[in-house]
Design a protein with these regions (language model features):
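Gram-negative host-targeted secretion-system effectors, predominantly Type III and Type IV
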Residues: 1-245
């Protein structure tokens, strides 16, 4: 099982008491890059032939299975970041890497592919972008303005705050039931919410929420679940259920 990816800085880890998680993730970042660059397990030895990179996608799938998609995305995006002025990066890859790294740690030293040709990494990046986009996850573009009060509305959780096994759009949609974090101007962070897909209740922080879902993006199944929840009457707020984060 892959070591859980920690996407924040050491300062944040120290503040939150997550230094062990930070170090374990940092070490796994290094193992990931070593694996991809190794003479025996690496990309060149296993997925590069006749100038074709990972033709069937099997090598990328293997790396994702071993290290997790978020870590693979980080290593590739970090590689772009470390040589952002290299003109061989495609505009799509450069923009993706910039957006990805904005929401991740600003410490770039650990976890980048220094021994793989830029053109090869660029192709690998295009492949993982395509795979990621295929998940059809909700993003900020599906949400209303941040000034909206979230209580009583369908909110979109940031999948980056979840374990990768829950990186599915149905797990992102929740009914916000309360908490000071629902209010855009409040100092509180807590957002209590019920997952529309399975009914589990959990406490999130406001930064884990992308926003309130625009009505036109609400799937039919979610609309039905929402009506069921609204018709059951008020329930006592509680945390618990599955641990998505």
């Amino acid at each position: 099982m892959a070591v859980e990816f920690y996407r924040y800085s050491y300062r944040t880890a120290e503040h939150d008491g997550d230094v062990e998680e930070y170090r374990a993730s940092r070490d796994e970042n290094r193992r990931c890059t070593e694996f991809i660059q190794h003479p025996q397990t690496g990309l060149y030895a296993n997925a590069y032939k006749d100038n074709v990179v990972d033709k069937d996608g099997a090598y990328l799938d293997k790396c994702i299975s071993k290290f997790g998609m978020q870590r693979m995305m980080f290593v590739i995006a970090n590689t772009v970041k470390m040589s952002k002025h290299d003109g061989r990066w495609s505009p799509e890859v450069k923009e993706w890497a910039k957006d990805f790294m904005t929401s991740h740690t600003s410490e770039y030293a650990d976890g980048y592919l220094s021994q793989i040709h830029t053109g090869v990494v660029n192709i690998l990046a295009e492949k993982i972008i395509k795979k990621y986009n295929g998940l059809n996850l909700f993003s900020r573009k599906h949400c209303m303005d941040e000034s909206v009060d979230m209580e009583g509305k369908v909110i979109v959780l940031n999948h980056m705050s979840m374990k990768e096994e829950y990186w599915k759009p149905e797990y992102q949609l929740c009914l916000a039931t309360g908490g000071f974090g629902c209010r855009p101007t409040a100092s509180g962070r807590a957002v209590y919410a019920t997952c529309l897909y399975d009914g589990d209740k959990a406490r999130w922080n406001r930064e884990n929420v992308l926003g309130v879902l625009k009505d036109e993006y609400l799937p039919d199944w979610a609309r039905e679940k929402l009506e069921e929840l609204q018709n059951t009457g008020p329930e006592e707020e509680q945390t618990g259920g599955i641990n998505l984060n």
